[in-house]
């Protein structure tokens, strides 16, 4: 009898049109992983923020045609992963499902689809290489609340230094650099979405894992490429982790250097890459004289990346029910209390 395997791919989600922008923002800011206030405060605050930010957010999405490309990009990854699993796991009927956190297909919708598939095994695979309570943690909590179907469940908690991920990043960076003529007056910026510093101080391993990803990729690059890690998309009054991407662009301009920027935590093109990197930061680079300004694409369906995901799924199958494991053997120290793969953590 053919085993049925459901692979659930988690990501942020994005509005599919102008009318979806405000409800998407409301769903985002009412998440306790994003705003930690009690519900009586959080819900009105989410309504206020989504209303006040709607106009500017719509303008950003208008640059991309009115909506986010994240779902179609993720669907391409799902189909590519299914094809890779068909080769890697003959005799297994593997089907990929997409669960978005803040817009359709929402977690509860996907949970019903997976239950109807009646799988023997369910592998939860967040499309966030680096674990954070604000992304992977939030998605897994929502799944646990909603899924009532069959199947032994295991989770790929993180994969910050997984070989396929690293190889794909390194290849794409090298290709962009060589296409530009292998410039030496350039600094590579590994740009990741930032977080409030208090999230990291509370034991979230995200920053540590982002920096590990960058270091692993840099080890596969020509030694003359100078690099640094920086963080983008800061909002609100809280202190965020740094340095910020815009400050690093200004620093490069002040040193008469160009920048080559690569999204190191985003695996798909969406508003933070197609608008923030391609428009806002490109304009900033021009203003401060950081030339050339090069942007490396997100991983998308890079073969090395997809093969790495397939290996992560294959390795997760057969583990004890409820196991949360790292696809690259990552093990946070005991001080990183929010990491499900930390030393001393139970499955």
Curated annotation (Swiss-Prot):
Signal peptide: none annotated. GO terms for molecular function: 2 iron, 2 sulfur cluster binding; ferrochelatase activity; metal ion binding. Pathway: Porphyrin-containing compound metabolism; protoheme biosynthesis; protoheme from protoporphyrin-IX: step 1/1. GO terms for biological process: heme biosynthetic process. It comes from the Bacteria. Its EC number is 4.98.1.1. Gene3D superfamilies: 3.40.50.1400. It catalyses: heme b + 2 H(+) = protoporphyrin IX + Fe(2+). Its cofactor is [2Fe-2S] cluster. Fe cation binds at residues 193, 272. Binds 1 [2Fe-2S] cluster. Homodimer. Catalyzes the ferrous insertion into protoporphyrin IX. HAMAP family: Ferrochelatase. This is Ferrochelatase.
């Amino acid at each position: 009898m053919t085993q049925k395997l459901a692979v659930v791919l988690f990501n942020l989600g994005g509005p599919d049109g102008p009318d979806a922008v405000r409800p998407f923002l409301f769903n985002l800011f009412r998440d306790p992983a994003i705003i930690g206030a009690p519900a009586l405060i959080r819900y009105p605050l989410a309504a206020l923020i989504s209303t006040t930010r709607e106009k500017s957010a719509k303008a950003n999405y208008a640059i991309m045609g009115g909506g986010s490309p994240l779902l179609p990009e993720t669907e391409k990854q799902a189909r590519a992963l299914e094809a890779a699993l068909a080769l890697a796991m003959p005799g297994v009927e593997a089907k990929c499902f997409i669960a978005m956190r803040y817009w359709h297909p929402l977690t509860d919708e996907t949970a019903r689809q997976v239950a109807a598939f009646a799988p023997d095994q369910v592998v939860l695979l967040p499309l966030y290489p680096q674990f954070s309570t604000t992304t992977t943690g939030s998605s897994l909590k929502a799944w646990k609340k909603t899924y009532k179907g069959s199947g032994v469940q295991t989770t790929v908690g993180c994969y910050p230094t997984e070989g396929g991920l690293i190889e794909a990043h390194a290849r794409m960076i090298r290709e962009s650099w060589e296409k530009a003529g292998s410039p030496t007056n350039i600094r590579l910026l590994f740009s990741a979405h930032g977080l409030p510093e208090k999230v990291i101080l509370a034991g979230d391993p995200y920053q540590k894992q982002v920096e590990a990803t960058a270091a692993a990729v840099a080890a596969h690059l020509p030694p003359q490429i100078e690099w640094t890690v920086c963080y983008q998309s800061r909002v609100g009054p809280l202190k965020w982790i740094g340095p910020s991407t815009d400050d690093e662009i200004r620093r490069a301009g002040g040193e008469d250097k160009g920048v080559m920027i690569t999204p190191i935590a985003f695996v798909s093109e969406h508003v933070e890459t197609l608008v923030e990197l391609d428009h806002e930061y490109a304009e900033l680079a021009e203003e401060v004289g950081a030339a050339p300004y090069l942007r490396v694409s997100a991983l998308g369906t890079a073969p090395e990346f997809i093969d790495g995901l397939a290996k992560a799924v294959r390795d997760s199958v057969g583990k004890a029910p409820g196991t949360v494991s790292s696809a690259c053997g990552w093990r946070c120290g005991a001080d990183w209390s929010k990491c499900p793969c930390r030393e001393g953590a139970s499955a």
